[in-house]
Amino acid sequence: MTAAITYEHIKTCKQSGARLGRVHTPHGTIETPMFMPVGTLATVKTMSPEDLKAMDAQIILSNTYHLWLRPGEEIIKEAGGLHQFMNWDKPILTDSGGFQVFSLSDLRKITEEGVHFRNHLSGEKLFLSPEKAMQIQHVLGSDIMMAFDECPPYPADHSYMKASVERTSRWAERCLAEHKRSGKDSVQGLFGIIQGGEYEDLRKQSANDLTALDFPGYAVGGLSVGEPKDVMNHVLEFTTPLMPEDKPRYLMGVGSPDSLIDGAIRGIDMFDCVLPTRIARNGTCMTSAGRLVVRNAKYARDFSPLDEKCDCHVCRTYSRAYIRHLIKCEETFGFRLTTYHNLYFLLNLMKQVRQAIMDDCLLDFREQFFEEYGFNKENARNF
């Protein structure tokens, strides 16, 4: 039986150790390292599937928790699965819903069986278990599914984190058993999630537990939750080597330009984040010269593009002054333009990262990019 998800290693950058590869899925092949736009409710906010294809998005992420609540998995099942429902014929990754249960619901009770919580929209009592998270994702029909994990708060003490890691490992085993029982493991790949916070011994314990289960891919969870960037990079330095070299490695919830480059240097293949779409709706844009808040008054008569060096449709067509006007008036078209540009910027950045790995010069690329973006300045504004 052919595995649903396989990883093909192409090259390691001699200068940085970053990996160039391909992830093969039932809906196509993805070049890595890569960034995944987030389509929480079966849509990347303000973008059409045609927009996403035009900017060369290879895969999108959707959210199990939100789709379970609205419209419900039964409606998506009637549509023929998530790909059919949203008219997207490329790969989809779905998260397990764990992060949302822990971040959106104030009233929750963690038991060995799963998590009891209240629907953040209606207040209705709900229960999500590893098995239920798998069953919903089977109906959604995503190419890559994520195991249901416990998402501990940051910071958390060692004893709390150890108990959490051990529960996540037991839940991962249950997820895998349910996935195999369903018979869907030939058409959907299930990734395990390594937890452990900033504790090296717990990351090692989590990685050992999960790699023993032989998932087709592995994610690093519990980062980008408020810790400083240098802590995240340090955790990646001791966690990534614990992950199999012949499987994809996914850093969850990371999407700032510096973190994408630094993550790739530390051996990560896949990234996702709501950052580019969320900040776009506030009029904040990523450009080759750094962060640009287009709603600011100084752009009222600025008829240049958002980014002189960007060749996206928005930068070729519209001015800062026009986009500022739209954003100030809360016109949806303005949010659409800034969203398109930000997503294009990150997808194009990852193309440049892949080329730099091919050319064995990713550290040189990082130095030049950081200098132009302004990351090297004292008190540099990040996202």
Swiss-Prot record:
It comes from Shouchella clausii (strain KSM-K16) (Alkalihalobacillus clausii). Catalyzes the base-exchange of a guanine (G) residue with the queuine precursor 7-aminomethyl-7-deazaguanine (PreQ1) at position 34 (anticodon wobble position) in tRNAs with GU(N) anticodons (tRNA-Asp, -Asn, -His and -Tyr). Catalysis occurs through a double-displacement mechanism. The nucleophile active site attacks the C1' of nucleotide 34 to detach the guanine base from the RNA, forming a covalent enzyme-RNA intermediate. The proton acceptor active site deprotonates the incoming PreQ1, allowing a nucleophilic attack on the C1' of the ribose to form the product. Belongs to the queuine tRNA-ribosyltransferase family. This is Queuine tRNA-ribosyltransferase. Homodimer. Within each dimer, one monomer is responsible for RNA recognition and catalysis, while the other monomer binds to the replacement base PreQ1. It catalyses: 7-aminomethyl-7-carbaguanine + guanosine(34) in tRNA = 7-aminomethyl-7-carbaguanosine(34) in tRNA + guanine. Binds 1 zinc ion per subunit. The active site is at D95 (proton acceptor), D272 (nucleophile). The keyword Transport does not apply. Zn(2+) binds at C310, C312, C315, H341. Its cofactor is Zn(2+). Residues 253-259, 277-281 are annotated as: RNA binding. Substrate binds at D95, S96, G97, G98, F99, D149, Q195, G222. Keywords: Glycosyltransferase, Metal-binding, Queuosine biosynthesis, Transferase, tRNA processing, Zinc. The lineage of its organism: Bacteria, Bacillati, Bacillota, Bacilli, Bacillales. Pathway: tRNA modification; tRNA-queuosine biosynthesis. The keyword Lipoprotein does not apply. Disulfide bonds: none annotated.
